[in-house]
Amino acid sequence: YHYLAESEKAAEHRASVAAYANLDGQEKNPGVPTLAVWAGRCGDATCSKPERNMPGAENVTIPNATHVQTSTSLETFQRMFKFFTGKRAKRDIRRVSKKSTIQLAGKALEFPQNTGLIGDKVEIWPLSSGGVRTTLKPIASISITDGSEGGGAWGPVTAKPYQRYEFALVEPEGKTIHVYMEPFVRSDYDIRLLGSAAISNDTGKFPKSSGAVTIRYKELWGNEPGQNDELLINGLEICTASLCPWSKEVNAYFAINWEGKEETTLKEEPALSSLPFIQAAQVFIRASEPPSEIVSYQLKSRTGGALRTLNIPNWEGTKNQTEIFWNDFDTPNS
């Protein structure tokens, strides 16, 4: 809104914009043709009243959706595509052959500053279904040389579809953030690998224990019977009603040994949990260097699809941190 209506060159900016989509944000019309998309669920930190409306815009509400889900959902994409092109989006369910290759690329960024992780190295390792590296060397090792805002570019790297990969962010001082994602089914040029002081400082405070932050850009719900997400670590449900109420809008869940105890209590960590979109709880995962066990992370989405599993080594947390990214879209059961 500021860019189109309040900035020094607002009139010039409006003249260059044919149409604009406002995703569950403020309610003032920016002065260009606008699609205003609203979350159907309101009453949380991101919206003050459910009857939101932007005068003069095409207003659309996504039923039973929360804030971030509204930005990433299929329903929102369909409405945006129609608004921008005048045509209905056709769903392409074709998948690339397992024998073909895909391209992977993106940025390595410090969160939330969005600056490139200059000096870090991105290593890409193929994994077995059990989460173990299958090669002696990474298929790619790329130094990050651009530390500017929006920098940190890496790739493209030739890879295989349906193959699991680990993206290792190796810091100059020797610490590593191990990033795990679900297998890619097509080329992706917008993979964000995130470094963060919170991740480095809070997931590895105590030796001989491991921790992880699990991220999905669709809120995790735990207090809505019949439409809850299941988020499991070694079979333990961590997305409980008290830790994942829908109004908390949990996108990032820190399962960490913040108390320094060899037990899992799911006690809420106060500092991280006070932040929007974040939850953190006491979870003890035994760890060693080198890893000696496999940890099972699983997700069953509230909106359908099969139970998903990512098996990951029990990296020792003082020098290794783990990030797990779940797709915001659902995988069919068949």
Spans of model-derived segments:
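Serine-dependent carboxylesterase/thioesterase catalytic core
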Residues: 1-45
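Active-site-adjacent alpha-helix of alpha/beta-hydrolase-fold enzymes
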Residues: 28-68
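Extracytoplasmic and endomembrane cell-envelope/extracellular-matrix remodeling and assembly machinery
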Residues: 60-61, 76-77, 85-89
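Post-His helix in hydrolase/transferase enzymes
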Residues: 70-81
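Beta-strand-rich domain onsets/edges
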Residues: 81-102
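Preference for solvent-exposed, low-hydrophobicity sequence contexts
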Residues: 107-112, 126-333
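A short beta-turn/strand-edge loop motif at beta-sheet boundaries
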Residues: 112-119
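Beta-strand signatures of extracellular beta-sandwich domains
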Residues: 121-125
